[in-house]
């Protein structure tokens, strides 16, 4: 099964690119983040015309997440369970595969900046609380004894090799020690971080480049989009 995640930064602006990519790549399940639209404004018909089932958790102007799947999406959950949140950052559903049920997600984890000098700014506290709630929910999912994938834009740079310049990110919410520790606690529940486990880290796995800073031509990227997997069966590659 081919899982994919994409922070589209406005589905309205990126729709032609999304449609072209879906036709070319043919992913089985896709998580989209930063839709920046309410559910009623999501271009459902255009995506369904390509053979995808669609579930959204939208929000006007900001945030918003969606799941697209070639298989029916069942048992849909909107919002991170156990966490009161006015922002639309989490959606979850179950797809039935020939190997059993797979619970899939689309996550748009808070950025967390500014952090404050002491790491106590409300935006950073919100990020850490959100990650703690995700850890708790992952523990719950593990109790179901079914495969699942936590996928999306985590706004976490896991390690020095996941950014073009570690020193440039020191003190940033994406790279603070507290962020690393929270991310590691989630993985240490027994999950597999797909890219890291494939031994293909480095600048060929960056997922974000700041267009305002001209980062793309210089390959000044970072890896902040992740798939954390709980698999009940093995595949030749965690990327498959």
Please describe what each predicted stretch is:
Residues 1-10, 101-116, 120:
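Active-site-proximal beta-strand elements of phosphoester/diester hydrolases
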Residues 2-11, 21, 25, 39-54:
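Internal alpha/beta domain cores that form substrate/cofactor-binding pockets in large enzymes
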Residues 6-7, 22-40, 104, 137-160, ...:
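Active-site beta-strand/loop signature of hydrolases that rely on acidic residues for catalysis
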Residues 35-38, 42-114:
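Structured beta-strand-rich core segments of catalytic domains in phosphoester-bond hydrolases
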Residues 50-51, 130-224:
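Metal-dependent phosphoesterases centered on the DNase I-like endonuclease/exonuclease/phosphatase
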Residues 61-76, 203, 214-232:
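Conserved beta strand-loop-helix elements of the APE1-like EEP
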Residues 81, 111-131, 169-171:
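Surface-exposed cleft-lining segments at the edges of enzyme active sites
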Residues 233-240:
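Conserved small/polar residues in nucleotide/adenosyl-binding loops
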């Amino acid at each position: 099964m081919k899982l994919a995640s994409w922070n589209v930064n406005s589905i309205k602006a990126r729709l032609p690119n999304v449609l072209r990519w879906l036709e070319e790549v043919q992913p089985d399940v896709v998580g989209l983040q930063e839709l920046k639209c309410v559910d009623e404004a999501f271009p459902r018909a255009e995506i369904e015309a390509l053979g995808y089932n669609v579930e959204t958790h939208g929000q006007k102007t900001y945030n918003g997440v969606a799941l697209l799947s070639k298989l029916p999406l069942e048992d849909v959950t909107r919002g991170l369970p156990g966490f009161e949140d006015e922002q639309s950052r989490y959606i979850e559903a179950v797809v039935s595969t020939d190997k059993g049920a797979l619970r899939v997600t689309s996550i748009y984890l808070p950025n967390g900046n500014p952090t404050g000098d002491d790491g106590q700014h409300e935006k950073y506290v919100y990020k850490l609380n959100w990650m703690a709630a995700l850890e708790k929910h992952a523990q719950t999912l593990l109790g179901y004894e079914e495969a699942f994938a936590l996928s999306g834009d985590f706004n976490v740079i896991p390690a020095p090799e996941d950014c073009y310049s570690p020193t440039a990110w020191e003190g940033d919410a994406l790279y603070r020690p507290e962020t690393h520790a929270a991310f590691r606690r989630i993985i240490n529940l027994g999950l597999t971080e797909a890219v890291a486990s494939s031994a293909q880290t480095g600048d060929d796995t960056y997922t974000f480049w700041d267009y305002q800073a001209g980062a793309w031509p210089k390959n000044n990227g970072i890896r902040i989009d992740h798939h954390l997997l709980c698999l009940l069966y093995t595949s030749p590659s965690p990327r498959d």
